[in-house]
Amino acid sequence: MKKQHDTIIVLDFGSQYNQLIARRIREFGVYSELHPHTITAEEIKAMNPKGIIFSGGPNSVYGEGALHCDEKIFELGLPIFGICYGMQLMTQHFGGKVERANHREYGKAVLKVENESKLYANLPEEQVVWMSHGDLVTGLPEGFVVDATSESCPIAGMSNEGENLYGVQFHPEVRHSEHGNDLIKNFVFGVCGCSEGWNMENFIEVELEKIRETVGDKKVLCALSGGVDSSVVAVLIHKAIGDQLTCIFVDHGLLRKDEAEGVMKTFSEGFHMNVIKVDAQERFMNKLKGVEDPEQKRKIIGNEFIYVFDDEASKLQGMDFLAQGTLYTDIVESGTATAQTIKSHHNVGGLPEDMQFKLIEPLNTLFKDEVRVLGSELGIPDEIVWRQPFPGPGLGIRVLGEITEEKLEIVRESDAILREEIIKAGLDREVWQYFTALPGMRSVGVMGDERTYDYTVGIRAVTSIDGMTADWARIPWDVLEKISVRIVNEVKHVNRIVYDITSKPPATIEWE
């Protein structure tokens, strides 16, 4: 990335939220990069950042395997902001006291600002924040003062303003912290003195150059699904290298209703790209027969997907690279070197060791909302840019347990009804992601005066900015009623509809 803008470095101590910190900073027009906690002070100095943020993490600073950083980082003279574990690490380094809390604090808490340091400038004295910690600071290091408290956390915020050192026990990067964005903004601009200067135009310029340098005169295969991510990847790479790109669209039989036809029409006819369609439904279904475990399903689908590409590439000449639409959120949900794994992702797990391609993942530093902005900048039509997020394993992870043709058809038809009614109600931009899932359970019902014993369909709809955290969508009851009535009446073997009202965390958006 060209250094024509200020940069904030985020050190990764294993928090599942660490990518969010960088995302929040980018929202302000300031570039931010995430780096492992093992990075050296010299390496940071060479990057010339304006400030450093220590992320949270699942460890205890006194526990076995506790993560630490190069202590010379504290001697660089840069502003440092420690979040949760990062605050505890800072406390330990400067001689303060960290202890195990009586009860792990998880969820919303009311924060009371006791000292208006630069971090809390122009913020209310009381605010709701998101806590997620098992340890807490019980003794301040020398030179530090208490900035904020909560009912369960006497030192919820601290600072040494003379040294530009700040710490908070809560997570300002999570949307549940109502003034978290403003607090991070105060650090970035008020403490570090950053100026806005990073935007999507910069990203496009740098990525096009990077793709051309990486690929040279070689050829690239793109895993095109018609979803937002792969569409943006295809258009970006096509813009960089033109006809050196060949798109392969694999119809694995796990797509939404009418999706395969739509993909071919849009990209082959509309964008004039070289798109090869592979009909592989039977191949995938044979591999998935009898498989119930979700991780195994993801791995099988991921492996088979790449093997199909291998087969197709062998028919083509000189294909060296495989392009994928891996996002920042994909990587964090699959676990980084320090993050605890939640679930494997199809773009970052399940790749065979003997894969014959080198990977190109031009979106792997972007979040979903940034990808949409990028798509618009590249001139991709709104109907594609604003398409629903759809996982690579497709409906394979929306049918819980073993996948059968009957179950796929139920999900495919019910999902089409849900999408149609959400669009009719004008909620398609308001609701970030919505889909149906089949939990595999049957229940007793009565239809036409006869007893039935049929499937239950689950509806999942969430509001979110970037997929890292999400709230369940408050869809109007009359809209939910229409959806429910239509699915039960129009989709065979369904007699009950349930609505998922769980936020993320603790649940993930997808059910598998």
Curated annotation (Swiss-Prot):
CDD domains cross-referenced by the UniProt entry: GATase1_GMP_Synthase, GMP_synthase_C
Secretion signal, residue range per the UniProt entry: none
Annotated GO MF terms: ATP binding; GMP synthase activity
Residue intervals of the GMPS ATP-PPase domain: 198-387
Cellular-component GO terms for this entry: cytosol
Pfam family, one: GMP_synt_C
Binding site for ATP: S225, G226, G227, V228, D229, S230, S231
Keyword Transport assigned: no
Catalytic EC class: ligase
SUPFAM superfamilies cross-referenced by the UniProt entry: Adenine nucleotide alpha hydrolases-like, Class I glutamine amidotransferase-like, GMP synthetase C-terminal dimerisation domain
Known catalytic reactions: XMP + L-glutamine + ATP + H2O = GMP + L-glutamate + AMP + diphosphate + 2 H(+)
Keywords: ATP-binding, Glutamine amidotransferase, GMP biosynthesis, Ligase, Nucleotide-binding, Purine biosynthesis
Active-site residues per Swiss-Prot or TrEMBL entry: C84 (nucleophile), H171, E173
Pathway the protein acts in: Purine metabolism; GMP biosynthesis; GMP from XMP (L-Gln route): step 1/1
Enzyme Commission designation: 6.3.5.2
Domain Glutamine amidotransferase type-1: from-to ranges: 7-197
Function: Catalyzes the synthesis of GMP from XMP.
Official protein name in the record: GMP synthase [glutamine-hydrolyzing]
Naturally occurring in which organism (per UniProt): Bacillus mycoides (strain KBAB4)
